[in-house]
Amino acid sequence: MNLRIKKWLEKLDQFEKILVHMPSIMYCGKLIGINGLVLEVSGLKLPIGTICIVEKNNSILDSDMIEAEVIGFRRNLLLLLLLSNVSDLTADSKVTPKILNGSYYNINKLPVCDKLLGRIVDGLGKPLDNFSKIDSKYNVSLTNVSINPLHREPVTHVLDTGIRSINGLLTIGRGQKIGLFASSGLGKSVLLGMMTRYTQADIVILSLIGERGREVKEFIDSVLTETVLSRSIVISAPSESSVLMQTRGAIYAMRIAEYFRDKNFHVLLIMDSLTRYAMAHREISLSIGELPVSKGYPPSVFSKLFSLIERAGNGKINSGSITAFFTVLTEEEERYDPISESARSILDGHIILSREYAESGHYPAINIENSISRVMPNIVDSSHYSFACHFKKIVSLYQRNRDLINVGAYISGTDPDLDMAITLIPKLNKFLQQGMLEKSNFLDSKKSLYSLFN
């Protein structure tokens, strides 16, 4: 009997905690349909971005409540998208707006503050590291006022990435937006780990969007030492999370980066991957009825993509910067990929990884011929740029004639430039390769480049 009373009292305590936070008037709708990922709800009128609670089995217990976001409306129906993957919903389930501090809880406001440093959170700012939740008083809007392009600080300072081939041949500027293009299995995660450890930045923000959940912990354990983690923030929305969580995770990471940029910090933002972000938006757009126009992608996906990328970069004059590395997944047999082409057109440069290099044990597997940094001519001296171009020419010349050389069809002395390329290529390949735990700062990389030709 005592055990039964104890259980009843525990239930009453749960109900009491819920009732304390309930407003005097509750607006309520009901679930009348599910179309793909989208829930159709009648009886409510709420702004886009509002979080609603869908009650399973008409229960008010936390365990039976599911959160969903208002993403649009159709005539008198609200369109909601679930924040988690749930399959046991029933018709006529009760739907109510979530209340926080006396007002509707809007997903477009999440915690952004210094307390996030050293933390690992999901796409909604909820802790994944078993530490305390960030107080809602730090919530700010995820949207931000765009900076007048005439007021932005130009990219004029070199960013030391600690990677010899990038420092020497694809020099990155502080505030630059770079794409890392690669298919699976080419050492992309290893290269990102090296950038995270060695890049000279005040704050590091890692946005892991739509990737394998197993890799999230492995990446954090192998890359984020205590020193690096203390100045880092990790936002994780793995592939098993909802598409809404994945899109929010990317936007949330960018908003945090903007916050620190506005405080005059130099921020390194690594987003892995931009392709998963676009795919998540595609699922949402198709679910609410948008028509696909390019390889299954609706037009709104590209506007979202450009909007996200353009938020990175330098801030106003004499303020901080966001140097962003966006990974883009490519299909080697696909001649045209709309996401890759769109990203390439708007980014300030691209680093392409080569399967041929990776399979031969050449790491990092950067294809120097096809990679480019568009700001490099503006931030390095003329001799450095000249040596980098000369390096690329020699590699390109050797690659074009490699088959002739390998089969013995080329006769030495026929082409002096090719003779020089054959002599230098072992040194050039050694310059391009670098161990995972090896760091090469900008000055050392520059000296190594010069020494190849002197």
Curated annotation (Swiss-Prot):
It catalyses: ATP + H2O + 4 H(+)(in) = ADP + phosphate + 5 H(+)(out). InterPro entries: AAA+_ATPase (IPR003593), ATPase_a/bsu_AS (IPR020003), ATPase_alpha/beta_chains (IPR050053), ATPase_F1/V1/A1_a/bsu_nucl-bd (IPR000194), ATPase_T3SS_FliI/YscN (IPR005714), P-loop_NTPase (IPR027417), T3SS_ATPase_C (IPR040627). PROSITE patterns: ATPASE_ALPHA_BETA. ATP binds at A182, S183, S184, G185, L186, G187, K188, S189. One of its GO terms (cellular component) is cytoplasm. It is found in: Cytoplasm. One of its GO terms (molecular function) is ATP hydrolysis activity. Pfam families: ATP-synt_ab, T3SS_ATPase_C. Disulfide bonds: none annotated. Its main location: cytoplasm. Its EC number is 7.1.2.2. Gene3D superfamilies: 3.40.50.12240. One of its GO terms (biological process) is bacterial-type flagellum organization. The keyword Repeat does not apply. Keywords: ATP synthesis, ATP-binding, Bacterial flagellum biogenesis, Bacterial flagellum protein export, Cytoplasm, Hydrogen ion transport, Ion transport, Nucleotide-binding, Protein transport, Translocase, Transport. Probable catalytic subunit of a protein translocase for flagellum-specific export, or a proton translocase involved in local circuits at the flagellum. May be involved in a specialized protein export pathway that proceeds without signal peptide cleavage. Belongs to the ATPase alpha/beta chains family. PANTHER family: ATP SYNTHASE (PTHR15184), FLAGELLUM-SPECIFIC ATP SYNTHASE (PTHR15184:SF81). This is Flagellum-specific ATP synthase.
